[in-house]
Amino acid sequence: LDAVERTLLRHALAALGEEERQIVLLHAVAGMKHREIAALLELPLATVLSKYHRALKKMRIILEGDDAR
């Protein structure tokens, strides 16, 4: 990623709630499986999965919005 892409990604991550951001980073950066994240955060697996997918959707909307400018 170049500097601009990293800035856009940080912006998209900052728009997420704390728990959503944590789940995305644990999965995408730390490489943890959703089941491991659920155990770590003491959340049901279904909750982790829904928060993860909701967070990705939010990030996609933000990033596509930045591309449209």
Question: Where do the protein language model's features map onto the residues?
Answer:
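Short, leucine-enriched amphipathic alpha-helices that occur as contiguous helical runs
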Residues: 6, 20-21
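Hydrophobic patch in the ABC ATPase nucleotide-binding domain
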Residues: 5, 16, 32-34
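Acidic, proline/glycine-rich intrinsically disordered inter-domain spacer in sigma factors
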Residues: 1-14
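Short alpha-helical "packing" element that flanks the helix-turn-helix/winged-helix DNA-binding module
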Residues: 9, 23-24
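Short helix-to-turn junction characteristic of helix-turn-helix DNA-binding domains
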Residues: 13-16, 27
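DNA-recognition helix of helix-turn-helix
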Residues: 20, 29, 35, 41-65
